[in-house]
Amino acid sequence: MIDRREIDVLRSLLESNAETTSTDLIERFGGDTASLQSVIESLERDGYCFEQKAGTIRLLSEPDAVRPQSVGARLTTHTIGREVYVFRETRSTNDLARQAGVGKASEGVVFFAEQQTAGRGTHGRNWVSQGNQGLWFSILLRSTLPVERWPVLVQMAALAAAEAAETWIDDPIAIKPPNDLVLGGGKLAGFLLETCNAWNFQVLGIGMNVRSAPQIEGYPTSALDDFARKRVPLSELAAGILNRFEDWYLRKTVEWVAEAVANSKFPL
């Protein structure tokens, strides 16, 4: 579990245009110079780079990978992303979320993997999840929607992912019902909803090709970076999807979502 202070310090640096004083951080989050330095050193061990001089701290760069600190520092959510876990490798993030659901974890926990060895799509198909080449993650939900309306959760995820991705590109993204996003004629992202009625939870899996897309014969694919105006930061994109998903999930009615998909600016 990531030290919450790492997220708070990183958020403060991002909000202050990457630089602030050590005194300000200590006043905001408590502790002393030694405890603040411990937080900075922990972040540095995880790939963050800082410049410290004359009592100021400047964030120079973040890891080119999904990190819970970078995602958490950009979240504006109340439920989705309340806990964020990142695994270098796992069989399937949906399996991790399912285990958490059975263990009575709170709604909104998110599991990311840099690489999945047994990721899956709809109808049991294999989902190729190459190391650090995209976003592969699952959200634990405890929706009170009637069972017959659970598929709308996939529509919410598709809208959220399309909205987040479009901020980096000029080309149109299309929602291809029931489970895909299409960009440039190839599959950009897919969504998988798995449910467990006995334990009253749903697992929403999301996969998006970002750095590159797997080459699959007879099945066109696309990667976001190939269309982006600049290299897309994975953690920033992930936070954007989670922020938008919560907006759809907590604030929009099922009818509103259905209308949004039907009249979407992301038509196929």
Language model region names:
Residues 111, 177, 202-204:
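Residue-level marker for buried hydrophobic side chains located in beta-strands
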Residues 51-53, 176, 194:
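Solvent-exposed beta-strand sheet faces enriched in polar/charged residues
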Residues 88, 175-177:
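Short loop/edge segments at beta-strand edges and connector loops
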Residues 1-46, 145-173, 183-268:
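Long, positively charged amphipathic alpha-helical accessory segments at protein N-termini or as interdomain linkers
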Residues 2-166, 231:
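N-terminal lobe of the biotin/lipoate ligase/transferase fold
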